[in-house]
Amino acid sequence: VKSTNLMAFVATKMLERQEDLDTCTEMQVEKMKASTKARLRTESSFAPRTWEDAIKDEILRRSVDTSSLDRWPELKQELENVSDALKADSLWLPMKSLSLYSEVSNQEPSSIPIGEMKHQILTRLKLICSRLEKLDHNLSKAVLGIQNSEDLILIIYNRDICKNTILMIKSLCNSLI
């Protein structure tokens, strides 16, 4: 999310620079403004989520009605009290997987049980890390074309943030392993 917002921010700064130099025609500037505004509007819809929000989204994705979310602690207790005969039922596995999501959400990264959940987290973190590395690479190329010292300072600052975020994600991945 931060990387895409960063790209939109850099695009906005580049647009301002273009306007200052007055090298574009008025129509091109308007097209670039519209494109930048559309990008910012699109990216703002992707807000950071907590584990609890992700759990609720997963529950909704699995077609559980929203009224049951208010009763989630009671439902979890009911799931834990299911008899052995019901465990053999075909509904038991999806219900059990829902309870695992809430248990995992409150745990330290190193104590998440080995399995599919840990693999999914690692896969997503590695994907985020690779996208941040690509963004860092693109920012390093953008530095070469910048002549304004303010823009240069902003890009260098954002590259540092990008690198620090990459290091934090790699550290988190190592703690999960």
Swiss-Prot record:
InterPro entries: Flu_C_NS2
Compartmental location: Virion; Host nucleus
Domain of life, source organism: Viruses
Assigned GO CC terms: host cell nucleus; virion component
Keywords: Host nucleus, Host-virus interaction, Transport, Virion
Chief location bin: virion
Motif (Nuclear export signal): 91-100, 117-127
Keyword DNA damage part of the UniProt annotation: no
Subunit details: Binds M1 protein. May interact with human nucleoporins and exportin XPO1/CRM1.
Function, in words: Mediates the nuclear export of encapsidated genomic RNAs (ribonucleoproteins, RNPs). Acts as an adapter between viral RNPs complexes and the nuclear export machinery of the cell. Possesses no intrinsic RNA-binding activity, but includes a C-terminal M1-binding domain. This domain is believed to allow recognition of RNPs to which the M1 protein is bound.
Name of the protein in question: Nuclear export protein
